[in-house]
Amino acid sequence: MDIVKLIRENNLIYLKIDALAKALSKLTGESVIDLKNEINSLIHDGSLFLDDEKKISISADKGFFKAKITLNRKGYGFANVEGYPDFFIPAFAINGAYDGDDCLVEIISRKSDEEIEGKVVKVLRHNTTHIVGTYIEGKSKNVVFPDDDKLPQIRILKNDSKNAKNNEKVWVELDMDSMDSKEVRGKVVEILGLANTPKAEQLSIIRSYNLIEQFDPNTLKEARSISQTVDKSQYKNREDFTSQRVITIDGEDARDFDDAIAVERIDNGGYRLSVHIADVSDYVKENSYLDKEAYRRGTSVYFSNQVIPMLPKELSNGVCSLSEGKDRLVLSVIIDLDKDCNVLKHRIVEGIIHSNHRMTYTEIKNILEGDNFLIEKYHDVYDDILCYQEISKKLLMKRHSRGEIRMDIPEPYILENASGEIVSIEKRVQDEAHEIIESLMILTNECVAKTYFDLKIPFVYRVHEKPDSEKVLRLSNMLKNMGVANQLQIDGDVPASYQKIIESIKGKTNETTLTKLILRSMMKARYTPTCLGHFGLASEYYCHFTSPIRRYPDLLIHRIIKNHLRGVPIQNLKLKYTPIVARASEQSSETEKTADEAEREVDDYKKAVYMTKFIGEQFVGTVSGVQEFGIFVELENGVEGLVRLEYLPSDEYEYDDMSMTLKGNNHHYTIGDTLKVIVANANTKLRQIDFELVGVEKNTLGSFVIKKKDNRTKKQTRKISKTTKSKSNKNKRKKR
């Protein structure tokens, strides 16, 4: 029943709730009490509007839009409205909304289809329930100053302080009833440590994303009740792979081994590849406490010195982990390949393995480079390792020929000592050992995805859609501006055209910067129940099957696969799992996004901490981004900082948004330029680093910026002088 439609069609507006419920009851025969509950729900979600006289109208008919508010620390904000560009909300029109709140907004002025100004009419829901901040004892009251300075200070009563001490970082649960009052209250639920200490600051970031290391008692009880050994009764109806030469290949510090491999040569120069994945679903039963907590977490979160696991260690490091010398339950994909690594056939089975060796990427790399000691140590699997290398190279060539976009971007690696001090930040590239595992897992994921697509069974796919046409055009213009010829198709339909560009810039000094520029033009990969292909891999069918210890989508599709293997009719699977895969896809995409943001912010904090040692020192860097307020420069170790506009030479600059360039009469800055910079400041609270150009004093004469977008010059937008502040780069990742 569509209540909003009934109200509109029968002109039942401006009635109070009792009168409206009675009128609707006469029309529908539904009880007045039930209708009042439904009306209240529609008021709470913003579909209906309750005015000061307690009369009800339809929000959309009044020109009100549902929106999520994003605030800037200066007080103004933006409303994200479906189907419209973001509304600009001036500070005077925020009307009690906080960052992240769901609101009703209305338009107050419209300069163009792209420039809309609005105001908050009503806050529907405050979405911030917990905050992280610094506890300060005052003479008359104790307060917490949130790390997020877009939020107000929080009053903490003595009984709600958990005996926090002055200048300690705390995690606070907000009193939601006080959110619309002049004084927001809360209670301390956890003391995180003394402010400005690395451990407390990292924990503060983790809590700000509502990430918790500990598992609840019910989940732990379930995990601890599971035997750490595989019972012989569990072998039933499983294929026995214990005689295979099975190995795992992981990092030196890894404890959770969820994939293992074995190989043998077959007729006509082909290969039989066995990829064994931990059968986590055998232990994490559907709707158990373990399952619900894994669903909530969605993924394991990895920091340089810490992991927040999706599953308790009793499973992730215990009976689910494919440890050396132990029998383990697996879900296996057996793939027959011809000599060119075309798939001849494959099958998916429940199995049991006994891992012969726990090997590391470093060991595999050294073996491939001819380390005789390691070759002798692993003599029983040496031929297999060479076989994996053959397969990987052939698979890599096949993916290249179909147009896979391969970006070899070095990742910053933060090295810390035992006391948590950051020793160095280095760039690390993926070596051949990593490529072997990557190639085998991609092949496995593709085989599994195609199987269940063809069967038309509900599934969770990993999709990467083609780039937005506007981003493709912008990228093409920027590359041409930097002298990189390209034939990018504006519809973004051919991944091979991207790969040609990447190959053309190989070996150039700005290769990494340009590759990152290409990456930023891409869509974000996500989970969905609809198979939309994977643009980056140039793959028609793709899923995540190979990491069920650390990713919920993998665990869920294991469960679906096992139900199918055990004979559950496809129609039954459709009825049961269609809604489940839809919810899980959305949830897992969100939890992955949260994990990525938390990992990035912790890394940014540690980079800022590390660079405090180098204040005043000179470095050579590459321009990695250009905005009207300044230029971003990336150092050789991957640390990025901002040279603000007032620290550029005095000039009249024109900023071109389409090519991301700042052009002056005498100076010109674009992505890929090499510059010498001085570390001017490293702000650990804001997680940002400021650079200055070597030999350039702060600009006291002023620099004009005439903003240019889509090749249409706009009026001068701002002038930098001694007294004006440049824009913050706090949200640089979202802007660029």
Language-model segments: which ranges?
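Internal insertion modules embedded within essential enzymes
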Residues: 133, 181, 671, 680-695
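Short beta-alpha connecting loops at secondary-structure transitions
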Residues: 537-540, 544, 654-664
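Short beta-strand-to-coil "C-cap" segments at the C-terminal boundary of structured domains/repeats
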Residues: 192, 692-699
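Electropositive polyanion-binding surfaces
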Residues: 22, 166, 171, 176-178, ...
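Charge-lined substrate channels and their catalytic hotspots, especially those that engage the 3′ end
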Residues: 1-274, 281-327, 358, 365, ...
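Acidic/polar residues at beta-strand termini and the immediately following turn/coil
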Residues: 51, 146, 338, 416-417, ...
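A short macromolecule-binding patch
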Residues: 86-90, 151-156, 639-655, 701-705
